[in-house]
């Protein structure tokens, strides 16, 4: 069985303390993961602090270069993740284009290359996002929840930028149910991850996540002889398979809101 871990970096604390702890953890267990990075104002910054460059994640660019040197994969997250989380689902094309352009240009200025992938904050999407991802020539995107790689269709927009969905319930959702104690969350996640899926299981965490919980998951997966893959490796394998088009819908995530989700396959519409 295969497992993929991705990390989304959206806060100043995540870009500093959180990343340092996770990088040390992944190094100790010799695991390569995919980091999706925002370069705009941190979600943990208040309104006035968001206006100053020191509270933008770009101010901590050195740690992002350390990620690359450690052999991990880098992908892009929205520039203003707070705005994206609250507005993207109902935004028009112009708003989405402005947000996309700002994220893209910030990425190009820092890394001198185009991003290879993108992940949407809180699984909030709209049709225009899929259009811009295809236009940018991304190798893949990971914006939604789901079960298998697919080409997204939303309203009148069809994209051939493959989606690699997150398959395991986000920790924010599990916590919102109030059904699990923090000390047993890893047991629930591990049980869920036992289901065999075409491209394996994909777990996304925040850079602020408790490293003790992350280590418990790694130890349990290692103990069950899991193979750890990065998202680019999953995308490469998916490219050799028959990828279908699926509609993208919405699913209510307990008290954690609504998340974009892989829905029905489009009849007889494959790559």
Label the model's feature ranges:
Residues 163-177:
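Positively charged, amphipathic and often flexible ligand-engagement surfaces
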Residues 1-117, 122-162, 181-199, 207-271:
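Catalytic alpha-helical scaffold of carbohydrate-active enzymes acting on polysaccharides/glycoconjugates
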Residues 202:
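C-terminal active-site rim and adjoining tail of enzyme catalytic domains
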């Amino acid at each position: 069985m295969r497992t993929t871990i991705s990390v989304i970096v959206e806060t100043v604390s995540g870009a500093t303390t959180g990343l340092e702890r996770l990088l040390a953890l992944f190094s100790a267990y010799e695991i390569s993961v995919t980091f999706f990075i925002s370069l705009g104002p941190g979600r943990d910054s208040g309104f006035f602090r968001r206006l100053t460059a020191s509270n933008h994640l770009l101010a901590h660019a050195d740690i992002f270069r350390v990620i690359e040197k450690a052999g991990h994969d880098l992908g892009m997250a929205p520039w203003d993740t707070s705005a994206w989380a609250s507005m993207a689902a109902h935004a028009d094309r112009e708003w989405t284009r402005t947000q996309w352009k700002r994220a893209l240009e910030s990425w190009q200025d820092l890394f001198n290359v185009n991003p290879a992938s993108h992940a949407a904050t809180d699984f909030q999407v709209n049709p225009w996002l899929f259009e811009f991802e295809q236009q940018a020539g991304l190798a893949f995107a990971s914006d939604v929840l789901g079960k298998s790689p697919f080409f997204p269709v939303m309203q009148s927009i069809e994209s051939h930028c493959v989606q690699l969905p997150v398959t395991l319930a986000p920790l924010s959702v599990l916590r919102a149910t109030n059904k699990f104690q923090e000390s047993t969350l890893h047991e629930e996640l591990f049980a869920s991850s036992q289901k065999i899926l075409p491209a394996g299981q994909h777990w996304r965490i925040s850079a602020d996540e408790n490293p003790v919980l992350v280590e418990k998951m790694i130890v349990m997966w290692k103990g069950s002889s899991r193979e750890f893959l990065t998202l680019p490796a999953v995308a490469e394998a998916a490219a050799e398979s028959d990828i279908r088009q699926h509609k993208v819908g919405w699913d209510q995530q307990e008290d954690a809101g609504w998340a974009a989700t892989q829905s029905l396959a489009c009849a007889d519409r494959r790559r």
